[in-house]
């Protein structure tokens, strides 16, 4: 079983599938979708006490997320949409449930896990699934 602390570190995106399609599914505009799809962000994961930090850095936009496991919070996404979010850790995976606050927004589920020394993520909204692969820096 993977320890939560094994996620800590800096991870560089090396492969992405369906990211632009995922952004389209959740209603992100064309120009932002194109710009975001061309970046290769670094994901920095830290633990401070019982607060996790998933900070994403890129030439396009930086996004910082701080949360406690199993504690609901309001998340402001990079496109300024607000979500009620709950993150759990189950079977070696961080699972983030992003529930829409406004009716015209879309809910998503993000899953993050480690496999063969890589950090893998899926983003799912509706029937669209994005897959991302990171390697440790």
Swiss-Prot record:
Tissue note: Intestine.
Name the record gives this protein: Fatty acid-binding protein homolog 8
Origin superkingdom: Eukaryota
Organism (species): Caenorhabditis elegans
Entry keyword Nucleus: yes
Compartment(s): Lysosome; Nucleus
Family of the protein in this entry: Belongs to the calycin superfamily. Fatty-acid binding protein (FABP) family.
PANTHER family, per database record: FATTY ACID BINDING PROTEIN
Lineage, broadest ranks: Eukaryota, Metazoa, Ecdysozoa, Nematoda, Chromadorea
Known partners and oligomeric status: Monomer.
Recorded GO CC terms: cytosol; lysosome; nucleus
InterPro entries xref list: Calycin (IPR012674), Fatty_acid-bd (IPR000463), ILBP (IPR031259)
Molecular function per GO: fatty acid binding; lipid binding; long-chain fatty acid binding; long-chain fatty acid transmembrane transporter activity; oleic acid binding
């Amino acid at each position: 079983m993977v320890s939560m602390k094994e996620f800590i570190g800096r991870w560089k995106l090396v492969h992405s599938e369906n990211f632009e399609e995922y952004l389209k599914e959740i209603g992100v505009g064309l120009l932002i979708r194109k710009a975001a799809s061309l970046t290769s962000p670094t994901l920095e994961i830290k633990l401070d006490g019982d607060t996790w930090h998933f900070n994403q850095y890129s030439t396009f936009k930086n996004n910082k997320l701080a949360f406690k496991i199993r504690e609901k919070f309001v998340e402001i996404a990079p496109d300024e949409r607000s979500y009620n979010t709950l993150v759990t850790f189950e079977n070696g995976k961080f699972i983030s449930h992003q529930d829409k606050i406004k009716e015209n927004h879309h809910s998503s589920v993000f899953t993050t896990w480690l496999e063969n020394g890589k950090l893998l993520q899926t983003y799912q909204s509706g029937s669209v699934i994005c897959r991302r692969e990171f390697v440790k820096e």
